[in-house]
């Protein structure tokens, strides 16, 4: 009975469980499908909205983009800059990354894709398919679609994480992360500062804090914080017609590999960065007839509201000085300067709006100014440019103008200039920086076009300035002497500047494509191929393309410059004095004198082992590269022996030294001499001397010639039987230290940016050490002959020199 009851109970239990499993859930029947949020549910009345390229909505701590559907597929340029940094990281404003992006709608997501224009082929060619297959657009970020816009013509996405998370292309550059050993983003100390929308761009600012095991030395937090600015700029629907680059005319350019060309290799094409200056349709006939016309759209620069009023007109003058160059291109009033509207006139005007190019005045101790620009990578069209003008650039200008012209120019004799004088200097730098913003790089070869003595002529310099290009680092006229009355002291927009602007900007109406323009562009270059004033030269191994130099003969120019420095030094106390102030200005300007002297030594020493570089094409006669003549190299070595290695005692002015330091002059002169000594005994320079002899034989200034001349100059006392003073003893020991370096070290790896400026050599498999040993053996014999006829200090010094020589000779294997 009991068993039957148990059986009955179990049967009923199983039956009830089975029936329960088959019965539908009442709860599931009553559950409603999840309702999708509407635009109004997400973008509430509390939202802060900024209308522009995308409408931006901020709801509490969340940011949303409302993207008009017509903008999907359009290409946009993302420019990432470091806006603000902590001390030790470098100053803000520097461009870190640029990428072309495309917003794509894919099912229920929005994709932000990276577009590359580095490799292309015409879409009408079969090879285009291969290019597309190898040029897949990676996805930078993916967003969920939150809702449609109110009128269903736009799409809403949340972008908070795009800027609050560590999206590397939009943050601190990967290359610099390694140096500071950054491990991760510290999200608790990172946040979005602002996102603002303008008609053609969106500006996002966010503070990023990174955990770092090797932060700048002044950081005690174990982190690095900086403010990042991302500019997303809508690119034109129709790219501007390109103009192809030619190395004979200096220009900022970009390159692209075109697989669609009818050649048997992949070929890189370079094209200019330049503003879109076009002739109005109604003015085309006037233009063809040689009349100047106003372009469809002018280049306009606004002067930052923060700029001190007294400097504004000079900044404007520097901008509009370029009008004369654009007239060569056929345009009048092509570039103009304006004050921005007041806040009352236009409360929405902002320097961050990409439609406006602005000279930004930055309250910073940095002695600098720069002129970067943003351009369309598809065509090179410059879209916008802001000149960063740091307040302390005036200190730099004062120092240059003082040390280079005070000997002949009363206006420069002081540590504070009249406003008119400083204004002229500001105008000069303004014009230089504007040159960068219209596409022109530095032309370091410009100043060597003028004969040195022409720079002492008032007639010549008033007509031509001090250099054919304001884009050279020609600075001010240090060659002019006190008797040269009325001579110009600084460059203007010159012959080369007009030539380059004409070449880069003058429209060629009959040319439909960039390729069609090439014949005309080549002719414009060939028309002036024999004119040094029209030459472009980039800094490198070419001694005629140097920074801070003037004239066609570095020796002669430097001799004039040193004469002026010798005039300045005795007057430094008087020209820097001010009652109630200490001697810090005296110390600064004395340091400037030594720096200027070092520049002269660099100008001359660059000729030793120097090679001239004159860009040419196949249809032009003559070599591209030519070694500096033997006679001139020897002249340069003699100059260095006389002016530098023979102690420059004119620097040793006790009336200055006893006011600025308790010690240091012996080390200062040693440092000045050893800097140039090490430059002369540079592996690359020595390798070029060897190659010069191999190619040109007896007409070359050889490595043995140079080393012999150097030894005889530095060890002159051995042959004249004079006492060796402390300055010369220091120099001679520096010489032996450098020879020891040559005998034991190899040339370091050459960074990619320097490969066009440095000659590579395997030192142990060259004649360099052979010649160095030969010089040491000769020197050893000469010391033995001389030391017994010397005073006690000289004898002790020569004993030390002999010990060093022996150590070098029996040192490491060679």
Identify the function of each model-found stretch.
Residues 447-814:
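Conserved catalytic/binding loops enriched for acidic/polar residues
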Residues 339-362, 424-431, 435-481:
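The catalytic-center signature of Zn2+-dependent metalloproteases
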Residues 1-25:
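Bacterial Sec-dependent N-terminal signal peptides
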Residues 66, 70, 94, 266, ...:
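Soluble non-cytosolic domains of exported or imported proteins
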Residues 370, 375, 381-389, 430-438, ...:
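Extended catalytic-interface subdomain
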Residues 23-63, 67-307, 325, 329, ...:
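Auxiliary tRNA-acceptor-end handling modules of aminoacyl-tRNA synthetases
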Residues 72, 310-334:
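Zn2+-dependent metallopeptidase catalytic core
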Residues 320-331, 435-436, 440, 476, ...:
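Sec-exported extracytoplasmic/periplasmic mature domains
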């Amino acid at each position: 009975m009991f068993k039957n009851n148990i059986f009955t109970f179990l049967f009923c239990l199983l039956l009830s469980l089975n029936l329960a499993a088959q019965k539908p859930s009442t709860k599931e029947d009553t559950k409603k499908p999840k309702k999708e949020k509407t635009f109004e549910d997400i973008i509430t009345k509390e939202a802060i909205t900024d209308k522009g390229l995308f409408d931006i909505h901020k709801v509490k701590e969340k940011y949303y983009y409302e993207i008009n559907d017509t903008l999907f597929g359009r290409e946009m340029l993302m420019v990432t800059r470091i806006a603000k940094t902590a001390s030790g990281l470098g100053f803000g404003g520097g461009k870190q990354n640029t990428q072309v992006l495309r917003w794509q709608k894919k099912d229920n997501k929005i994709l932000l894709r990276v577009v590359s224009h580095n490799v292309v082929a015409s879409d009408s060619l079969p090879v285009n398919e291969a290019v597309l297959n190898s040029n897949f657009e990676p996805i930078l970020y993916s967003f969920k679609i939150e809702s449609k816009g109110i009128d269903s013509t736009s799409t809403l996405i949340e972008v908070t994480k795009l800027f609050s998370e560590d999206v590397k292309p939009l943050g601190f550059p990967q290359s610099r992360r390694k140096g500071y050993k950054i491990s991760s983003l510290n999200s608790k100390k990172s946040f979005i500062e602002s996102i603002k929308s303008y008609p053609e761009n969106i500006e996002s600012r966010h503070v990023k804090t990174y955990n770092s095991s090797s932060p700048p030395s002044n950081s005690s937090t174990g982190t690095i914080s900086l403010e990042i600015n991302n500019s997303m700029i809508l690119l034109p629907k129709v790219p501007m017609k390109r103009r192809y680059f030619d190395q004979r005319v200096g220009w900022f350019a970009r390159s692209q590999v075109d697989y669609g060309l009818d050649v048997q290799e992949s070929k890189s094409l370079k094209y200019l960065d330049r503003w879109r200056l076009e002739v109005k349709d109604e003015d085309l006939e006037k233009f063809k007839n040689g009349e100047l016309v106003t372009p469809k759209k002018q280049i306009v620069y606004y002067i930052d509201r923060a700029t001190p009023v007294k400097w504004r007109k000079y900044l404007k003058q520097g901008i509009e000085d370029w009008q004369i160059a654009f007239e060569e291109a056929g345009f009048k009033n092509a570039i103009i300067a304006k004050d921005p509207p007041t806040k009352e006139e236009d409360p929405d005007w902002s320097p961050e709006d990409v439609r406006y190019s602005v000279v930004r005045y930055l309250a910073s101790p940095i002695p600098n100014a720069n002129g970067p620009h943003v351009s369309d990578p598809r065509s090179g069209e410059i879209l916008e440019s802001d000149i960063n003008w740091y307040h302390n650039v005036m200190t730099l200008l004062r120092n240059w103008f003082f040390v280079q012209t005070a000997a002949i120019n009363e206006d420069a004799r002081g540590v504070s200039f009249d406003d008119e004088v400083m204004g002229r200097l500001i105008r000069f730098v303004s014009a230089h920086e504007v040159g960068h913003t219209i596409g022109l790089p530095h032309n370091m070869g410009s100043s060597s076009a003028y004969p040195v003595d022409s720079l002492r002529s008032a007639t010549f310099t008033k007509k031509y300035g001090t250099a054919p290009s304001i884009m050279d680092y020609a600075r001010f006229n240090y060659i002019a002497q006190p008797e040269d009355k009325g001579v110009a002291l600084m460059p203007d927009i010159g012959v080369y500047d007009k030539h380059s602007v004409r070449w880069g900007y003058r429209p060629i109406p009959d040319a439909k494509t960039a390729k069609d323009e090439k014949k005309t562009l080549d002719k414009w270059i060939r028309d002036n191929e024999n004119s040094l004033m029209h030459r472009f030269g980039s800094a490198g191994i070419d001694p005629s393309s140097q920074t801070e130099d003037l004239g066609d003969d570095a020796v002669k120019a430097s001799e004039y410059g040193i004469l002026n420095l010798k005039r300045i030094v005795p007057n430094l106390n008087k020209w820097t004095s001010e009652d109630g102030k200490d001697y810090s200005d005296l110390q600064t300007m004395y340091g400037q004198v030594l720096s200027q002297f070092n520049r002269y030594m660099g100008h001359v020493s660059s000729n030793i082992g120097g090679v001239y570089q004159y860009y040419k094409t196949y249809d032009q006669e003559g070599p591209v590269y030519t070694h500096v003549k033997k006679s001139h190299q020897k002249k340069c070595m003699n100059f260095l022996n006389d002016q530098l290695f023979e102690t420059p005692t004119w620097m040793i002015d006790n009336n200055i030294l006893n006011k600025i330091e308790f010690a240091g002059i012996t080390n200062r002169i040693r440092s000045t001499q050893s800097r140039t000594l090490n430059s002369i005994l540079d592996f690359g320079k020595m390798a070029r001397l060897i190659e010069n002899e191999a190619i040109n034989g007896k007409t070359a200034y050889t490595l043995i010639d140079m080393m012999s001349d150097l030894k005889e100059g530095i060890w002159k006392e051995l042959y004249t039987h004079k006492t060796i003073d402390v300055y010369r003893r220091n120099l001679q020991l520096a010489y032996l230290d450098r020879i020891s370096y040559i005998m034991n070290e190899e040339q370091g790896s050459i960074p990619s940016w320097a490969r066009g400026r440095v000659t590579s050599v395997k030192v142990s498999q060259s004649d360099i050490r052979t010649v160095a040993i030969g010089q040491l053996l000769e020197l050893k014999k000469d010391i033995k002959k001389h030391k017994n006829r010397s005073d006690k200090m000289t004898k002790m010094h020569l004993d030390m020199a002999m010990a060093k020589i022996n150590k070098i000779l029996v040192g490491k294997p060679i």
